[in-house]
Amino acid sequence: MMKVLVVFALLVTLISYSSSEGIDDLEADELLSLMANEQTRKECIPKHHECTSNKHGCCRGNFFKYKCQCTTVVTQDGEQTERCFCGTPPHHKAAELMVGFGKKIFG
């Protein structure tokens, strides 16, 4: 039984060593992907800023991506225009509140 465990441990060690070289290549690809995501994150629209022209470009909040929320504004001339801003929807606010409350209770 001891021989089987030793052989198994050697096989696991060899497999993990050989796969670690492949993981290094994956880590380089992931790093490039993360750098690209960081660039798009810099170009996103922050909370409470106008998103009328780019309704899918809102940034991420603490837990969720902000949503472009639109309202119809009537000017003094009676002209209706749509104005949009990035914000947190009510159901996301409730979820963030519950998570914050849970963190306070459970540490």
Swiss-Prot record:
* Cysteines engaged in disulfide bonds, as pairs: 44-59, 51-68, 58-86, 70-84
PROSITE patterns according to UniProt = SPIDER_CSTX
Q: Name one GO cellular component term.
A: extracellular region
**What are the GO MF terms of this UniProt record?**
toxin activity
One family from Pfam that matches here is Toxin_35
- What domain of life is recorded for the organism? Eukaryota
Tissue specificity note: Expressed by the venom gland.
Q: Give the residue range of the signal peptide.
A: 1-20
Q: Which residues form the propeptide?
A: 21-41
Keyword Secreted (UniProt)? yes
Specify where it is mainly localized: secreted
Alphabetical keyword list: Disulfide bond, Knottin, Secreted, Signal, Toxin
Subcellular compartments: Secreted
Alphabetized InterPro entries for the sequence? Spider_toxin_CSTX_knottin, Spider_toxin_CSTX_Knottin_CS
Q: What family does the entry list?
A: Belongs to the neurotoxin 19 (CSTX) family. 04 (U1-Lctx) subfamily.
Entry comment, domain topic:
The presence of a 'disulfide through disulfide knot' structurally defines this protein as a knottin.
This chain belongs to which protein, by name?
U1-lycotoxin-Ls1e
Q: Which source organism does the UniProt entry give?
A: Lycosa singoriensis (Wolf spider)
